[in-house]
Amino acid sequence: MNFWDKIFLKGIKKFPYGSLQIEWPDGKFQKIDAIHKGPNAKLKIVDSNVVREIIQGGSIKFAELYISKRIITNNLTNLMHYCALNNDQAEETFKITIFRYLYNKYLHFKNKNTKIQAKKNISHHYDLGNQFYKYWLDKSMTYSSAIFNGKNDNLELAQNNKYQKLADLSSIKKGDNILEIGCGWGGFSEFLAKNYDCQITALTISREQFKFTTERMEKANLTSKVKVVFCDYRNIKGQFDKVLSIEMFEAVGREYWKTFFEKIKTILKPNGNVGLQLITIDDKIYNVYKNNPDFIQKYIFPGGMLPSVEVLKNIIENTSFRINSINSYSNDYAKTLNIWNKEFNRNWTKIEKLGFDERFKLLWNYYLSYCEGGFLSKNIDLKQINLKLN
């Protein structure tokens, strides 16, 4: 056992939750049990350089090693859950190097969400092709967490539940003039138009989503109610009774969080309100997270950033809003991600024919399991929030 292996084991033995069974490159097994119950994870280390690279490269390197098949596990979600539960101890064990610190600063700067860069960042993820997403999302083409009212709810019903809860939270009524910031593939706008007889302006900066949503409203005969606009939220004009947004705030970027709420304040009618669904990160890990881009920010959502609840509250209160209500749904997101992951893999043969390779498959498996583990551990949470002007 070399120097790096000893450091690695010393750190793992301090983890308080679950167990980790390691298969070393020489074929020997070693199991480390923590004091408290948790997921039972397995990790196969393929070559002798892996541990050194994990310690020197941190969580992003860990992801890259999985994608390159130099670490292997029989249950990726269990491993991600194990890592997330023991996040505090992992941060203490695998200290950040000055090179990683400077590189992280560069990544944040490079992906800063200016109006031009925001389009590039969104395109990086959402313009992989509508057919790609069709193969593993539900029929409503909803790419955000569902809410399961009962254990027998299928994904499509649970997505409808989510729409209904946010509409109720936002007091949507017939005749409202609504702005949806980040409309995705149009599921929520269609739901509102059909169920509330509203006028909706649906914003997107994804070319693929703009095309799909425009065609969707034409097919549903809803063009008189839903106006799909290719526009950055910072450029929108008008006055709205309600401003709604589902999991778009995560793409705004920390430098523009205040701008987001300041802009909404200028377009919201005096008695209007705001309904948001968004992901938050635990306050206790926010400070480390905000300075160190993770796997998601490097490979999946460049320019993205999650707020903590306290940070979010401070920004909201400093922009003349107040939180009227807030609800949490972390377990629902974990279940949604689990379903997506299964559907992604079940349909991989079709996805592969679109031109995606094995590395892409492993990247997306890691992404979906990484997020599921985060929600299971409660390091990240899903919130539905209603805001009103003071």
Per-segment meaning from a language model:
Residues T280-N390:
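Substrate-binding/catalytic lobe of Class I Rossmann-like enzymes that use SAM or dcSAM, i.e.
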Residues R234-V243:
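A short acidic, Gly/Pro-enriched loop at the edge of an enzyme's catalytic core
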Residues W185-Y196:
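Conserved SAM-binding loop of SAM-dependent methyltransferases across substrates and taxa
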Residues M1-D153, L157-Q159, K165:
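Feature captures hydrophobic
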Residues T213-T214:
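Conserved SAM-binding loop
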Residues N271-I279:
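Conserved beta-strand signature within the Rossmann-like core of class I S-adenosyl-L-methionine
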Residues K174-G182:
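Conserved class I S-adenosyl-L-methionine
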Residues K258-P270:
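A short glycine-rich, Lys/Arg-flanked "PGG" loop and its adjoining helix->strand segment in the class I
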